[in-house]
């Protein structure tokens, strides 16, 4: 059964309601940050205090940590905890290769979700990513798989990921376009129909627009929850519980 992070659903709902009733100015729902922009181990200033302060004060309810592989940074555990303690929900995106080895540097928190990139179960890294997912689940973390749609997508590759998510008891599935090409974005829309949970389908669109943004600081500024894509929701949505 899929778990939905209660803190995440609550923060997104509050932000949407505030914007609908104009009690809060329009702003980003999701803010992306590359830890390489903030963490500089070995230098005279290992942490950019100015950028860290701006990040902690950011009004977006969700912070997506991605870009360069976060687990390559020695201070990533403290970095994640600082952001989560500031009141943000945090998604830490990783290829999962080093997740099992470094899982002890993190603490399960209601505000933290570990997002493991997994486009195919046949890739060379999939075995290590699977072990990382298992270690995270056994340690009590919220986990999601992030699958990216590329131009050369094999339409069958995601059909094997779907039963894998159920079998491994992963909490969610995000599917996003890897580029802004019209054909790729269209394929991502079609692929998202494989996601049983309507919440994760909608959140996939939040993440996709944020990651595809060309601005130096990538943000998703559209707080609208439903689009025409949601017309295709499946009638038999899987069991979901808030945790």
Q: Where do the model's predicted regions map?
A:
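A C-terminal junction/extension of Radical SAM enzymes
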Residues: 178-243
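Short secondary-structure boundary/capping segments
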Residues: 22-24, 106, 232
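Radical SAM/AdoMet-radical enzyme domain recognition
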Residues: 49-65, 73-177
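Short beta-strand segments
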Residues: 32-34, 64, 147, 176-177, ...
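Hydrophobic, Leu/Ile/Phe/Ala-enriched alpha-helical segments that form helix-helix packing faces
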Residues: 21, 133-137, 165, 187-199
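Short, polar loop/linker segments at the starts of domains and inter-domain junctions
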Residues: 45-46, 124-125, 185-186
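N-terminal pre-core extensions flanking Radical SAM catalytic domains
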Residues: 1-45, 215, 220-223, 227, ...
